[in-house]
Amino acid sequence: MIKLISFKNCPFVQRVMGALVMKNVPFEIEYIELNNKPQWFLDISPNGQVPVLITENDTVLFESDAIVEYLDDKYTPIEEVSPEQKALDRAWSYQASKHYMPQCGTMASKDKETFETRLANLQKAFLKAEKKLGDTEFFKGDYISNVDIAWLPLLHRAFVIKASIC
């Protein structure tokens, strides 16, 4: 069985978990402490970061983008797309994942001014996504895709941020 290594509430792991769940791939998850990473984890993770996915063949994969692409290649894709559409989907997914850490930084802001500046930058990213969505619920219209899965961690945290300022 596939094994996913994580720490609690990691947006990069949430993206991988979303892909696993959407594809109905059974997996187990093992949580580690971010501030006290075990040596076995440091031995298998080239960058010492999560997520790490260990395949059925004991191959260790790292970096969420690479893991999600592996899952799409290994298991039935959520959808069949042209090479051009696949590149567009990746680009929109990268737009999401590059904002994971800035969003976490926004949530950890120490003062109101820093929070508001960081929030304004995040809002720009969401406005671009909303423009792409148009009147549809999902990036591809009426069904969830890999792009939507990439945006899930941001949307989850946006809800948390909104709840804290309202």
Question: For each predicted feature, which ranges?
Answer:
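GST-like domain detector, emphasizing the conserved glutathione-binding G-site
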Residues: 1-139, 143
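Short helix-capping/linker segments at secondary-structure and domain boundaries
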Residues: 2, 24-26, 158-166
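GST superfamily/GST-like fold recognition
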Residues: 141-165
